C-alpha cells in the first residue's frame, strides 16, 4: 500500500515530496512555514487521500521503514563478511578427492582476500586487537585462518597418497581377474587416466 498511496504524490511533485520525505522531522519542527507549505502543496494532489494528515503520517512511516531497511542491509553485510570464512572452512574440511583438484587452486588465492579484509577491519577500530591474539576480536580470525590453513594442508598432504592408493586396489583385482599382463597394463592405465581426468 506504500506504492499505491505515494504514486500520485511522487509523479506530480517529486522534488518537494523527496525533500520532505528525507527531512520530515527537521522541516516540521524547525520550519513551521515548511510544514504549512507542505500541506498546501500536497492539498491539490490529495484527491485520492481523505485529509492532509495521511501524507505526514505515511512520510514518518516511510522514514521508519527506510531506517529498518538500512539496519537490515547492515546486518546482511555483516553476514556476508562472515560467510566467506565459513564456506572456505567447510570446503577445506570436506575430504572429497574428486573436488580437491578444483578446490585447492581456488582456496589458495581465495583465503587471503577475506582474511585481509577481516584483519584490516580489526586494525581500524583497535590496533591492539590484532597484536594480542588473546582478545576475542582477533581470536576468531586467527583460529579460523589456522583451521582453514591446517585443513588445506592436510588435504594437500592427503592427495598424493590418495592419488596413488586407488590404482593399487584395482591393479590387484585386475591381476586376479585378468591373467594376461598386457591387458592388465592397458586396462589399469586407461581406467586410471579416465578416472582422474573426469
Swiss-Prot record:
An example molecular function term from Gene Ontology annotations: DNA binding
Biased composition, class Polar residues, residue ranges: 95-105
Main localization category: nucleus
GO cellular component: nucleus
Region (Disordered): 16-117, 152-198
Protein location: Nucleus
Known role: Gap class segmentation protein that controls development of head structures.
UniProt biased composition (Basic residues): 17-31
Feature: compositional bias, Low complexity: 35-46, 68-83
Extent of Basic and acidic residues compositional bias: 179-198
Full protein name: Protein hunchback
Gene name of this polypeptide: hb
Key words, A-Z: Developmental protein, DNA-binding, Gap protein, Metal-binding, Nucleus, Repeat, Zinc, Zinc-finger
Entry's Gene Ontology BP terms: segmentation
